[in-house]
Curated annotation (Swiss-Prot):
GO BP field: base-excision repair
The protein's required cofactors: Zn(2+)
Protein name: Endonuclease 4 homolog
Organism (species): Dictyostelium discoideum
Subcellular location, record wording: Nucleus
Length: 542
């Protein structure tokens, strides 16, 4: 059986259809496609060679030899169709060999075509353009002209067998040379790429070495700073069992100050009373303030006995001085109110809060005296405050009622030392009455305590008018408002109009020792506590 191949070449789209047995193969190339299908037939019919896709079949002495495996055809690469039987009956008439001139012309044409021929791309899905042959018979490709391609080429191919054999040898040599040239070009390109890679590696190594050297220079060990032995090391404070004991040894006078100056802050009780003292000690507090009742309500909240027991135990275990606990009263309290209903509410609420202090074992309770509301005079309102204190002290035990000075905002009482003096003077049991000085309130009320000299004068006046024996607490606040503005606006220590001299004066004056000094600033309190303790001076070095 002889294969019958129909070539349909479309010049516009440059497509080739091969109809071979049951398979239709469509090939698309970006340029001219040169395909080769050779057919050799001798008169003895000893050898029949079929080239189909990737297979070359031989028929010799009624034996089929398959040179390559075929994965695409179902028939195992055997070409079998009825149309091919008709071709077997035709006779092939060999032509005389061509002359030398014709051979030279053909070679020149082939060389010109080879220059125009693009590089062949491998198509794994179909078959490679270069046809593989057996060792016995090597068949060279036949380059057909696309413009003159038609069905007549099949008959001319059968007639020009000798012509093919002569031309195939020349084309084989040319193809081998082309392949060698392509291999040489590929080798040269590979060598160039290797050289470029080496250069790039050298560059990267140089850059890495430079970066490592620069990084090494940057990572050089820093020079150690020389420490002066005379430098003040007070900034390092230990907050363990020995509170505020410094790493360096101090004189006895400074140690006494560190032990007797009681600084703390106003904290929340949202985490409960049992853990309150532990938390404030961890922040370096030696004094503390809190609300025993919500500050903006008339409702009464009673401290639980279990909480009070744990609170007392924590105070004893941590050696926390109970006299330095100064709870704050509700903002609704107005013991000088001209309104009888509100006056009674205020008295009942303060009684309840002072009883909470009794349950906790606390000995002092701080409150704002109230206001006259422009309905009565200041002196009349001060008398009502004193009467309210007598009423409350008769119904409570042991707890001292501590009157806080005010900024004089609105119609508030207590913005002068004389107001405080008159209230105390009218109270029957003076042992249970005390005073709390707020630095911001004093400054806003007109007491300019921004300098040390002014502090000397003002606190001497306080001692004459009221007396330090009634001083039970101090609120440490800087002021956002100016002196005499009568605006109660707290600021962090050293950041307001008062400045640090006043607070340095307070922590170094013995008259303020063992008195709770409470911060009511925005915080954080632990940093401000350290700052205030750093203001303590050594009297022996003066």
């Amino acid at each position: 059986m002889n294969p019958f191949v129909n070539l349909f070449i479309q010049h516009s789209k440059k497509q080739i259809f091969l109809n071979n047995n049951k398979n239709n193969i469509l090939l698309n190339f970006n340029s001219k496609l040169y395909s080769t299908i050779t057919y050799k037939n001798n008169n003895n019919n000893n050898n029949n060679q079929i080239i189909n896709n990737k297979t070359i079949m031989k028929r010799k002495n009624n034996e089929i030899i398959q040179t390559e495996e075929d994965d695409d055809n179902d028939n195992g690469g055997i070409h079998d169709c009825d149309s091919c039987d008709e071709v077997d009956n035709e006779e092939i008439i060999p032509e005389s060999p061509p002359s030398k001139k014709l051979q030279q012309q053909q070679q020149q044409q082939q060389q010109q075509q080879s220059k125009l021929k693009p590089k062949q791309t491998s198509i794994t899905d179909f078959f490679s353009p270069t046809v593989k042959t057996s060792k016995a018979d090597k068949i060279s490709p036949f380059f057909s002209n696309v413009n003159n391609a038609s069905t007549t080429n099949t008959t001319t191919n059968n007639k020009n067998v000798n012509k093919k054999t002569t031309t195939t040898t020349t084309t084989k040599k040319r193809n081998n040379k082309d392949e060698e040239n392509e291999d040489d070009n590929e080798e040269e390109e590979e060598e160039e790429e290797e050289e470029e890679d080496k250069k790039s590696k050298k560059k990267t190594t140089t850059t890495t070495t430079t970066t490592t050297t620069t990084a090494y220079k940057k990572k050089s060990s820093p020079k150690k700073k020389k420490v002066n032995p005379t430098e003040n090391k007070f900034s390092t404070i230990n907050y363990k069992d020995d509170q505020y004991v410094q790493k360096e040894e101090y004189s006895s006078s400074k140690k006494e100050k560190l032990e007797n100056v009681k600084i703390g802050g106003h904290v929340s009780i949202k985490n409960g009373y049992p853990t309150l003292i532990q938390s404030v000690v961890a922040q370096g507090f030696k004094a503390v303030a809190f609300f025993t009742n919500p500050p903006r309500t008339w409702k009464h909240h009673t401290v639980k006995l279990d909480d009070s027991i744990k609170f007392k135990q924590s105070c004893k275990s941590l050696n926390f001085d109970v006299n330095c606990i100064l709870p704050h009263g509700s903002y609704f309290l107005n013991l000088g109110s001209p309104n009888k209903e509100n006056l009674q509410k205020s008295r009942d609420l303060m009684i309840h809060e002072m009883k909470n202090c009794e349950i906790l074992g606390v000995k002092h309770f701080n409150f704002h005296p109230g206001s006259h509301l422009n309905e009565i005079s200041e002196s009349e309102s001060i008398k009502i405050v004193a009467e309210s204190l007598d009423y409350i002290l008769e119904r409570t035990k042991d707890v001292v009622a501590v009157i806080e000075c005010t900024a004089g905002q609105g119609t508030n009482l207590g913005y002068t030392f004389e107001h405080l003096r008159d209230m105390i003077a009218l109270v029957k049991d003076k042992t249970r009455v005390g005073v709390c000085l707020d630095t911001c309130h004093m400054f806003a009320a007109g007491y300019n305590i921004s300098t040390k000299s002014n502090c000397d004068v003002i606190f001497q006046e306080f001692d004459k008018v009221v007396g330090f024996k009634y001083l039970k607490g101090v609120h440490l606040n800087d002021s956002k408002s100016t002196c005499g503005s009568k605006l109660d606006r707290h600021e962090n220590i050293g950041k307001g109009h008062i400045g640090t001299p006043c607070f340095k004066y307070l922590v170094n004056d013995k008259r303020f020792q063992n008195i709770p000094m409470i911060l009511e600033t925005v915080g954080p309190y632990d940093q401000e506590v350290k700052l205030l303790y750093s203001f303590i001076e050594d009297d022996d070095k003066k």
